[in-house]
């Protein structure tokens, strides 16, 4: 079993939608797959199942640990299938929503990741959260190229140096919508 690290993946983003709308995109499976994944199962109560399949090959799954409507969602996270060294439920994702004017400030903390999985998950959230912001604000985030990642590509990405993953992630973020650079 991989050893968890004390380092955190932390992200923050402002979304031009009220917390109630953002919360729906975090907890309604039909809305969730509009910004992340090919399929999702989410039982929005403590102990309920949390499962999202970003690529169509290796679902991430865990349990809902805490849920406060329109304010907070905490769930365990890990990958089924063994392609990544993070079994289901081994790490924890905490999402806090705060009103910010007419929008929402979303703060995400992903903890208990093995050291070799920080960059991978950091880039994953760097990719997914802007897509959430677009769809929650009523926009179309466009096609999701992550859905076309093969299992072998997923395994190979694990071994890339963090600086390469960072550059790759920044390039994808800059070109994610309508051809205009997004920074």
Name each model feature, range by range.
Residues 10-11, 17, 21, 30-63, ...:
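Short beta-edge strand/loop motif at the mouth of beta-sheet-based domains
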Residues 19-20, 65-71, 96-105:
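A short, structured loop/turn motif at beta-sheet edges
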Residues 134-174:
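Short, highly charged C-terminal tails/helix-capping segments
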